[in-house]
Swiss-Prot record:
It holds the Pfam family AAA_lid_4. SMART domains: AAA (SM00382). Its main location: cytoplasm. It comes from Alcanivorax borkumensis (strain ATCC 700651 / DSM 11573 / NCIMB 13689 / SK2). This is Holliday junction branch migration complex subunit RuvB. DNA binds at residues 313, 318. GO terms for cellular component: cytoplasm; Holliday junction resolvase complex. The gene is ruvB.
């Protein structure tokens, strides 16, 4: 996949992460776009603080770029405690996790990103730590090996994943709070873009913010990335102010259309439409035809196309919808067995 894909929801570098951190909301009051999640977390956090207890272990899942890491930081800040961050792939050995757990203070939040990628060995250590606040570790090797238990202070594990279905049942069942993040509305994204412009001192008109939001695929990270590219365009091709016209010209230059589709999306849809007669086509066949990794298509490209109704998953594979044909101004070919042809 093109490494320069501007509308990917995956963070593409440390510089972008630093820029996103500068505009990250610091409280639930500023965490817009997920009203149900915000309401529930406010109740759970207030209740835990009222009882002077650590918040229940929390699992946050949803597509990339929707604010899982941001919510973890907000939880720690609202609870008035420190946050320690790590990720599933980093915790290769039981000792890696033990080193982190033994350095936690009472009430601390341990944030584990990509928690579905924890190794089975590390998961086994995590179970008693989550359930009983105890760490079971082995000392020595062979016949002289012995198990000792270390008491841990009450803490909150916040796990984030884009693939909740890959979590093992024992791990998933140990989370007392489970929150799913949804794609954002255009109005919510417009507010996020305007807020970022206020923080970064970028002059922007309401219509310009709305145009960026409309093409951001319901994802704040993409909205912020598009905003930076539109700002570049406005400074070079205009007077620095982001108007609706400037935003449209900049995004057209980036080949991001009015529905947020880019070249990769259009190539996938075009392949199904013209090489596979609209589908259905198996994922592996589609990946081979596009010279892409099937996992990348399934995890990165497809979710938005499915959510927007451009493709559907069937038992026989992927197929484009009538909405996709209409978007490209094409007539769906009549197939054998069709009773209706709209």
């Amino acid at each position: 996949m093109d490494n320069e894909r501007v509308i990917t929801a995956v963070a593409v570098g440390s510089q972008e992460e630093q820029q996103d951190r500068a505009i990250r909301p610091a409280s639930l009051a500023d965490y817009h776009g997920q009203p149900k999640v915000s309401e529930r977390m406010e109740i759970f956090i207030d209740a835990a603080r009222g009882r002077n207890e650590a918040l229940d272990h929390t699992l946050i899942f949803g597509p990339p770029g929707l604010g899982k890491t941001t919510l973890a930081h907000i939880i720690a800040r609202e609870m008035g405690c420190d946050l320690k961050s790590t990720s599933g792939p980093v915790l290769e050995k039981a000792g890696d996790l033990a080193a982190i757990l033994t350095n936690l203070e009472e009430g601390d939040v341990l944030f584990v990103d990509e928690i579905h990628r924890l190794s089975p060995v590390v998961e086994e250590i995590l179970y008693p730590a989550m359930e009983d606040y105890q760490l079971d570790i082995m000392i020595g090797e062979g016949p002289a090996a012995r198990s000792i238990k270390l008491d841990l202070p009450p803490f909150t594990l916040v796990g984030a994943t884009t693939r909740a279905g890959l979590l093992t049942a024992p791990l998933r069942d140990r989370f007392g709070i489970v929150q799913r993040l949804e794609f954002y509305s255009v109005d919510d994204l417009s507010g996020i873009v305007s807020r970022a412009c206020d923080i970064l001192a970028i002059p922007i008109e309401a219509a310009g913010a709305m145009e960026v939001a409309r093409r951001a695929r319901g994802t704040p990270r993409i909205a912020n990335r598009l905003l930076r590219r539109v700002r570049d365009y406005a400074e070079v091709k205009g007077d620095g102010r982001i108007t609706e016209e400037i935003a449209q010209r900049a995004l057209d230059m980036l080949e991001v259309d009015s529905c947020g589709l880019d070249g990769t999306d259009r190539r996938l849809l075009d392949m199904i439409m013209h090489k596979f007669d609209g589908g259905p086509v198996g994922l592996e066949s589609l990946a081979a035809a596009l010279n892409e990794d099937s996992g990348t298509l399934e995890e990165v490209v497809e979710p938005y196309l499915i959510q927007q109704g451009f493709i559907q998953r069937t038992p026989r594979g992927r197929a484009v919808t009538n909405h996709a044909w209409r978007h490209f101004g094409l007539q769906r070919p009549r197939q054998d067995g069709d009773l209706f042809n709209d």
